[in-house]
Amino acid sequence: MLTRRFLAFAAVVIFISGAGLAAQKSASLTAQDFVDIQTLYARYNWAIDAGDAEGYASTFTPDGVFNNNVGHDAIVKFANTFHAGLGAHVKHWNTNLMILPTPEGATGQVYLVLVDFGTKPPTLFTSAAYSDELVKTALGWRFKKRTTKGDVAPAPKPPQ
């Protein structure tokens, strides 16, 4: 009786493990996918920094989301507003890109530093992190959803 329970338990564990491995294998990215996704990140930065609102919006799916901007038109409007206010003198720098496969496409995380070139010498304007949902479309990889979380400096320590 105990042997049957053990064998049944072992069979369930093996089945679940196999299903997990199958899901991992189906969620994989090729070397070309990684290159294409890195290129998407670069296109995003170059477009927003150059004031190319349509090029910037084209890095998203038509129903894409950037923070609270939903859809192509809202993303174009955001890009135009950003560039009119800050964009002419700031540049986006990304580092530590991490791309992970998902059954739907991929997730991405990357650090963002905005450098203000309107000051002499150039200064760090702000820093943040992006969290992304990416999908592969007929036009290539696109952002489905992109959220930004700004870095917050710790509160100063009280004098002792």
Give the location of each predicted region:
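N-terminal secretory signal peptides that target proteins for export/translocation
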Residues: 1-4
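Bacterial N-terminal signal peptides
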Residues: 8-18
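Short, low-complexity N-terminal intrinsically disordered segments enriched in polar/charged residues
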Residues: 21-50, 54-62, 73-74
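Short structured motifs
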Residues: 41, 92-97, 129-130
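Short beta-strand segments enriched in hydrophobic/aromatic residues
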Residues: 48, 60, 112-114, 147-150
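A solvent-exposed, acidic/Ser-Thr-rich amphipathic alpha-helical stretch
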Residues: 53-114
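Short, cysteine-centered beta-strand-loop-beta hairpins and adjacent loop/turn segments enriched
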Residues: 87, 115-124, 153-154
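Short beta-strand edge/turn micro-motifs at domain boundaries
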Residues: 107-109, 127-157
